[in-house]
Amino acid sequence: MINVNADPQEIAKFSELAHRWWDPDGEFRPLHQINPLRLDWIDRLAHLKGKHVLDVGCGGGILADAMARRGATVLGIDLAAKPLKVAKLHAMEAATASVEYREVAPEHLARELPSHFDVVTCMEMLEHVPDPSSIVQACAQLAKPGGWVFFSTFNRNPKSFLLAIVGAEHVLRLLPKGTHEYARFIKPSELAQWCRDSGLALESTRGMQYNPVTRRYWLSAETSVNYLLACRRPQ
């Protein structure tokens, strides 16, 4: 495994649960529930059909597989070998022909394939690495001029601590305890600055909300907890 900008404990955490990745009622249920929302948002802005797409931190391939089914040619990358094996197996079983997976760091791939992708996605990943700004820079370098770059992560404030950690992990048990570290959450202003520093132009920001009674997620202008950010690399 390439040891670049990765936390071994984070890799071990998700590797341990890799066999559960495609269980819609398992530990990754929230990812399955939010996937249609983020997929539609990305597709609405970037028009995935016929595009060459990179999914950074793809894990078991939930988003990568869905984007391929929207007509994109997708490469999913991660540094956790076990989730990648699960992603490859699922692609084979589901006959998703236009998706491939590689164990490689985005910083390394940016040197190998600069300005290569029409769309780059990095969802629910930045809060799990030691240097998220380095990931943002690599994503910018991987996008073609005019290409789209998408991020999603958690805001850092008392409300996000209460809802995303206390509520989601300890009260509602939507996620395993220890899934997230509050200190690694990222304010939208911080992420936006990293994007600008990497030469990206901000296009759209949306929040993601959850109703524990109806168990329904939706996008809104409220970015105080989970949020998504869309950028473009200038032509």
Region annotations inferred by a language model:
Residues M1-W22:
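N-terminal, positively charged/glycine-rich alpha-helical extensions of SAM-dependent methyltransferases
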Residues H32-K49:
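Conserved alpha-helix/loop element of class I SAM-dependent methyltransferases that forms part
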Residues K51-G57, W148-L172:
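Conserved class I S-adenosyl-L-methionine
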Residues I62-H108:
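Class I SAM-dependent methyltransferase SAM/SAH-binding core
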Residues A110-V119:
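A short acidic, Gly/Pro-enriched loop at the edge of an enzyme's catalytic core
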Residues S133-P145:
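A short glycine-rich, Lys/Arg-flanked "PGG" loop and its adjoining helix->strand segment in the class I
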Residues R173-E190:
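Acceptor-substrate binding/catalytic loop of class I
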